[in-house]
Amino acid sequence: MTLNQEQIMNYFTRIGLNYDDYKCHKLDGQLLAKLCFAHNISIPFENLDILNHKMISLDGSILYDKIITKHRGGLCFELNGLSEIFLRSLGFGVKDLSSRFFRDAGDDIPMQRHRLLKVEAVDGTYIWDIGIGQRSPKYPLRLAEGLVQKQCGEVYKLEKEAFYDWVLYEYYKEQWLRILSFTEQ
């Protein structure tokens, strides 16, 4: 699915931005950051459909109707799913990735139960994740090993590990903690 011009404009409105201010902007990390932050403060992570025993659809037109038209939120699969369509419609290169959460996983190998996006911009590759629903990056992270990235009073970095491949860490309470891992496959 690709969003048409009207749908793109509606998406911008839903996240509190004026499409005309961005329609000629180059497809770079600066634009990604503005879009991601606007999305994070405008569209909530929510699981009301699960609590109400309603089926969740990952069909793009259904996601658009739920999140943009009906002003709802969603889970990571929904929010990042619609974001993938939106970013691709703007012209970004986007790849859907599965990931594993480490929070509350204990010593077990966490299941792949989270969706995030790898986005190709003109100035590099970024990780976009607007569907965590708890302490997490508010802006896309540059996909670069060991690069410490500060945002909104929080500190993150990505490291490569043999078993998990890419691992996202946050610096919290004087230590680096794993948040999630993903591969680029």
What do these predicted ranges mean?
Residues K23-K26, K34, K54, K66, ...:
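Context-gated lysine
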Residues L3-R14, Y19, I43-P44, R100-Q185:
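His-Asp-centered catalytic microenvironments across diverse enzyme cores
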Residues N40, G81, V122:
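Residue-level marker of positions within ordered structural domains that often coincide
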Residues H53-I56, I85, D104-G106:
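Short active-site-adjacent helix-start/loop capping segments
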Residues R72-S98, L117:
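Cysteine-centered nucleophilic/redox motifs
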Residues K66-I67, L87-G93, W128-D129, P140-L141:
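N-terminal start-of-chain detector that recognizes signal peptides
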Residues D49, G81, S98-R100, I132:
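Short glycine-rich, polar/acidic loop-and-turn segments at beta strand-coil junctions
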Residues T2-H71:
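Secondary-structure boundary elements
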